[in-house]
Amino acid sequence: MGKELTIAMPKGRIFEEAADMLRKAGYQLPEEFDDSRKLIIQVPEENLRFILAKPMDVTTYVEHGVADVGIAGKDVLLEEERDVYEVLDLNISKCRLAVAGLPETAADTVAPRVATKYPNVASSYFREQGEQVEIIKLNGSIELAPLIGLAGRIVDIVSTGQTLRENGLVETEKICDITSRLIVNPVSYRMKDAVIDEMASRLSLIVEGEKAK
């Protein structure tokens, strides 16, 4: 039997889409896998172990080697800048990082305060735009900041834009498109390159197949 592979997966939508991809790639995951409340799930038939984590923590687990590979959004990779290999764009969980605000202030570059849970990405973006802003880090409900006068603009993940519209906000600038990526711990890749390459290859075939539809 080959070496066991530990995979860090984020809870939520990315988990569901990634599990579906793994099944399409031929990995036999049990039915209860999707609904399990366990944080560590063993799949001995495939020699896999899954760690279920918060999206922002996946890169930490992979960087420190407690997980060999992980599935993380590009937004997290840009924000955290961890020492991991990004080996495959899975092309799932598509969304974008964008700037938004109230209609009367969103386009006002004089608004100096920007609320976000991505302070590094936001700082870099506005620096490139030649804007001096004060970044206010929040951990959730970013859309609230302009409504209560905490910040003139926000930087956040946008999928359909429905949450922005429901709160009277408008998107003014797209920073970048976001998808989920397969990431690898550098040491794990040296020790388990064959099994990691096989997983990346099998998933890559699924990605290309979906693009061809």
Curated annotation (Swiss-Prot):
Q: Which GO terms describe its biological process?
A: L-histidine biosynthetic process
In alphabetical order, the GO MF annotations are: ATP binding; ATP phosphoribosyltransferase activity
**Which one Pfam family would you cite for this protein?**
HisG
Quick one: where is this thing mainly located? cytoplasm
The pathway this protein participates in, as annotated, is:
Amino-acid biosynthesis; L-histidine biosynthesis; L-histidine from 5-phospho-alpha-D-ribose 1-diphosphate: step 1/9
Q: Where in the cell is it found?
A: Cytoplasm
Q: What class of enzyme is it?
A: transferase
The domain of life for this entry's organism is Bacteria
List the EC numbers from the record. 2.4.2.17
**Alphabetical list of CDD domains matching this protein:** PBP2_HisGs
Recorded GO cellular component terms are: cytoplasm
Subunit and interaction comment: Heteromultimer composed of HisG and HisZ subunits.
| NCBIfam families on file | hisG
- Please give the family membership noted in the entry: Belongs to the ATP phosphoribosyltransferase family. Short subfamily.
Q: What does the UniProt entry state concerning the protein's domains?
A: Lacks the C-terminal regulatory region which is replaced by HisZ.
Q: What is this protein called?
A: ATP phosphoribosyltransferase
What organism, scientifically named, is this protein from?
Bacillus licheniformis (strain ATCC 14580 / DSM 13 / JCM 2505 / CCUG 7422 / NBRC 12200 / NCIMB 9375 / NCTC 10341 / NRRL NRS-1264 / Gibson 46)
Q: Which gene encodes it?
A: hisG
